[in-house]
Amino acid sequence: MAVHQGTAQALPLPDASVDVVHARWAYYFGPGCEPGLAELDRVVRRDGTAYVIDNDASRSTFGSWFRRGYPEVDPTAVERFWSTRGWTRIPVDMRWSFTSRADLESVVRIEFTREVADAVLAEHEGTEVDYAVNLWWKRF
């Protein structure tokens, strides 16, 4: 195994040189990530597989926060984007669990603007948040 530094739209790899790709929050929100997906088409070998994990804004507490923070991202359009390009969706339920409220608040403030973070934190109690993601996969 080797690790290379690069960007999704300019992978430092030869054509048809990769068997498995795993990308987590690298191809944000579907539309707009076409250059990165074109790179996957280039570098993944025939019968190779790519896996992409992305937020599922259509469900979960975090999903409702995400819709507030990023109202321009349409969950239905994102799903259509991936599925019309031959990707298969596996919904995954997970959870953020923190040892302190301060830790939860710190992470929420990384994810959202001050206004959105303040609002969702004021409405949410505790140190856990249910979080839904989509695992998108495609065989090449």
Tell me what each language-model feature is.
Residues Q9-V21:
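A short acidic, Gly/Pro-enriched loop at the edge of an enzyme's catalytic core
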Residues T49-F81:
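Conserved class I S-adenosyl-L-methionine
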Residues F81-S83, T88-F140:
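Conserved Class I S-adenosyl-L-methionine
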Residues P14, G32-C33, T61-G63:
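Short glycine-/acidic-enriched loop or helix-start segments at secondary-structure transitions
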Residues E34-T49:
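A short glycine-rich, Lys/Arg-flanked "PGG" loop and its adjoining helix->strand segment in the class I
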Residues H22, R68-P71, V107-V108:
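Short, hinge-like loop/turn segments at secondary-structure boundaries
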Residues D19-E34, D56:
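A short SAM/SAH-binding and catalytic strip from SAM-dependent methyltransferases
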Residues M1-L11:
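Class I SAM-dependent methyltransferase SAM/SAH-binding core
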